Amino acid sequence: MSQLKIGSSQCLWTSICIVLFVLSMARGAVSRNYGDALTKSLLYFEAQRSGKLPSNQRVTWRGDSALRDGSDAHVDLTGGYYDAGDNMKFGFPLAFFTTMLAWSNIEMATQLKAHQEQENALAALKWATDFLIKAHPEPNVLYGQVGDGNSDHECWMRPEDMTTPRPSFRIDAQHPGSDLAGETAAAMAAASIAFAPSDEAYAQILIGHAKELFEFAKAYPGIYQNSITNAGGFYASSGYEDELLWAAAWLHRATNDQIYLDYLTQASGTGGPRTAFSWDDKFVGAQVLVAKLALEGKVESNGKIAEYKSMAEQFICNCAQKGSNNVKKTPGGLLYFLPWNNLQYTTAATFVLSAYSKYLTDAKASIQCPNGALQASDLLDLARSQVDYILGSNPQNMSYMVGVGTNYPKKPHHRAASIVSITKDKTPVTCSEGFDAWFNNPAPNPNVLMGAVVGGPNDNDVYGDERTDYQHAEPAPATAAPFVGVLAAVA
């Protein structure tokens, strides 16, 4: 009897050891998957490049394109990134994802370096900032769009074949756009911090542009789509107060100049409680940056500063399901904000969680939510759960990042990826031929858009993988940029 007990005990312990070993191996596999996803997330930006591609271009199915952008205005507007799955360059979302790429480079510099991706991450950022510098040729002039959104969307063409009009649109003193100028100022200021350790001269150039753009945004108030009306149907801004706070917060972090902190504390409001962080709504970002100052003890956490911090933490509490207005979750556990490209909001919110986890750790602080406390580790655990969902731990067992695992979207809504590469067939694909032969083709895309994150599933965790479903199948840099930082944080 005792021998039986001993044998059973040994069997039990053997079973436990096997289970623990399997779990540890699975955990290691996930960890390695984060690193793989991080590498691929940066490859995606190379697939989005416009202009003359560099000799070290790794996404070789793409070719040079849009080499005359800006010629109608006698300005060089080549380079930069295409928007989502089309061939447009929309300055407003472009500037936002540039800011988020910069923030990823800043907060997760150590992790990016450890995974040997810092050089690639900075290269992705510089491809954007080089373009933004060219788009700002005078203190009160900023080019905010290249291409006509309507004609572009009426065609399905490779960027290398484009025959659609490429008009250049700008804002200036007579045609203002405080939101566009403010967001671009934020991008330049944030990028200056990212580049300062390796290229101080370039960082100073960026700071100069950021300061000019911030003054331009303040001096000539206005919503940019009233000046660039073509943008209104695609990326309409809901206001410019958030961009001005966001820009001031980044300029203060980059320069430590009191005037930018004064702007933040003397503003009429802090944005109040927000339900999302996105290319249109930067209040959460500004709130988080000011909260960081308070956590570091660089400013007194009272008055307006305390309000910024409270609003930032209220957003985090709601994401963590411990607030008074919690973010909806799908049955599978995904933070769900809006039906159209929900993952852009999820990755942005998850970046906030990752960054704030770092701030709390450094400050040895926690958050007191209406329904319980949150430690730094809780925030990172929630961020990791969202990453895991996006990379395949979901009811469909599908990775929503292209190229990760074997079950991932094969037909993302993306012109360049869905048409045979120009390196394989140089025969031009016309506007209508693209729709007939490629857009409506039920086959998978001929080019794998490695690292792209699609719009994601609906609120019931269902994803159909149809090229025609642009609300769920279209990837965008605004989704990918914050995800770079999140992946680095959890890798």
UniProtKB/Swiss-Prot annotation:
- Stated EC number for the protein is 3.2.1.4
Name a single GO biological process.
cell wall organization
Any one Pfam family match given in the protein's UniProt record, by short name: Glyco_hydro_9
| Carbohydrate attachment residues | N397
> For this protein, what is any one GO molecular function term?
cellulase activity
The terms describing its cellular component in GO are: extracellular region
Q: Which Gene3D superfamilies match?
A: 1.50.10.10
Q: Which InterPro entries match?
A: 6-hairpin_glycosidase_sf, 6hp_glycosidase-like_sf, Glyco_hydro_9, Glyco_hydro_9_His_AS
Give the signal peptide, or none: 1-31
Identify which residues the record assigns to the active site: D86, H413, D465, E474
At the top level of its lineage, which domain of life is listed?
A: Eukaryota
* Subcellular localization, as worded in the UniProt entry: Secreted
Q: Which reaction does it catalyse?
A: Endohydrolysis of (1->4)-beta-D-glucosidic linkages in cellulose, lichenin and cereal beta-D-glucans
Give the UniProt keywords, A-Z. Answer: Carbohydrate metabolism, Cell wall biogenesis/degradation, Cellulose degradation, Glycoprotein, Glycosidase, Hydrolase, Polysaccharide degradation, Secreted, Signal
The entry assigns this protein to a family as follows: Belongs to the glycosyl hydrolase 9 (cellulase E) family.
Query: Which PANTHER family does the entry link to?
Result: ENDO-1,4-BETA-GLUCANASE (PTHR22298)
The protein's name in its UniProt record = Endoglucanase 14
Please tell me the species this chain comes from. Answer: Arabidopsis thaliana (Mouse-ear cress)
